[in-house]
């Protein structure tokens, strides 16, 4: 189920040598605990952050609520559970791509001057270069400069570390879902973002909602799951779940009309710029 090297890496734009190992364990655990629960595995680790350790049973319980006919097993066994709570120095960070969901949340919390966090998790090895990631960095840097906020970028192989095609054969048959959509992506993003949050002593990581009330979708990025995630002194808010996509567009349009806020939406997934031809581009243009 894992890549040939059985190795997951994460690269940050700052020195992580002073961050405790119990916190640095969070990114890998945020990607493999769901696997352990699905396939009833035990995960052993030397040390883990106390807040994260205590949030895992709640996240597991949320998955069980989604998939009532499937029994989740597995657990985490840690030699040491360490309390890493610390003073808060900055109010917020935001998982940011420049899309509708992330931009809406930015406009709702911009008074807190969030650190924007963009992650590229589709590398196969450390030397991989991506034109898409470079385009993301360029666009988000412009956005950050226009709005006088900071941006941090993360490079990883968490999306290729576990081979989705192999896991999906099981999940499609038993749960009618896929690994990335149903179990991995938001927890993977929050896991690496938690290191940024710890480094800057951030209180809250915001993640924009993908869906809203009334949409019965078994997606890992769900308020029942995301809001339970916690590391050290940082929590998570799954934002704007009460808004439909059209209502989010209204927030963006109103910000432009009323305050001339600079917004350049980037909605085309895995492309250097909006193609203006795909379903998502057309849908966004019509909504605007």
Where are these regions (language model features)?
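Nucleotide-activated chemistry modules centered on ATP-dependent adenylation/adenylyltransferase
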Residues: 26-27, 31, 36-43, 47-94, ...
């Amino acid at each position: 189920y894992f890549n040939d090297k059985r190795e997951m890496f994460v690269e940050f734009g700052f020195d992580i040598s002073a961050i405790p190992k119990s916190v640095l364990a969070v990114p890998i655990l945020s990607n493999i605990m769901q696997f352990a629960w699905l396939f009833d595995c035990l995960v052993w680790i030397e040390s883990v952050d106390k807040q994260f350790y205590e949030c895992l049973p709640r996240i597991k319980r949320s998955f069980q609520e989604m998939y009532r006919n499937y029994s989740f097993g597995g657990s985490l066994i840690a030699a040491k559970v360490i309390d890493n709570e610390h003073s808060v120095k900055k109010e917020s960070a935001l998982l940011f791509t420049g899309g509708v969901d992330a931009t809406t949340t930015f406009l709702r919390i911009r008074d807190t001057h969030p650190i924007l966090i963009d992650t590229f998790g589709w590398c196969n090895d450390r030397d991989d270069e991506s034109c898409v990631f470079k385009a993301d960095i360029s666009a988000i840097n412009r956005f950050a400069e226009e709005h006088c906020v900071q941006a941090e970028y993360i490079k990883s192989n968490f999306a290729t570390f576990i081979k989705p095609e192999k896991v999906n054969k099981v999940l499609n048959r038993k749960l009618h879902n896929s690994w990335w959509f149903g179990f991995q992506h938001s927890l993977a993003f929050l896991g690496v973002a938690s290191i940024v949050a710890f480094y800057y002593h951030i209180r809250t990581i915001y993640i924009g909602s993908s869906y809203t009330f009334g949409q019965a979708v078994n997606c890992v990025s769900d308020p029942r799951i995301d809001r339970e995630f916690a590391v050290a002194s940082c929590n998570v808010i799954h934002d704007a779940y009460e808004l439909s996509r059209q209502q989010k567009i209204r927030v963006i349009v109103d910000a432009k009309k009323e305050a001339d806020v600079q917004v350049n939406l980037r909605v085309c997934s895995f492309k250097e710029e909006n193609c203006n031809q795909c379903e998502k581009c057309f849908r966004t243009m019509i909504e605007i």
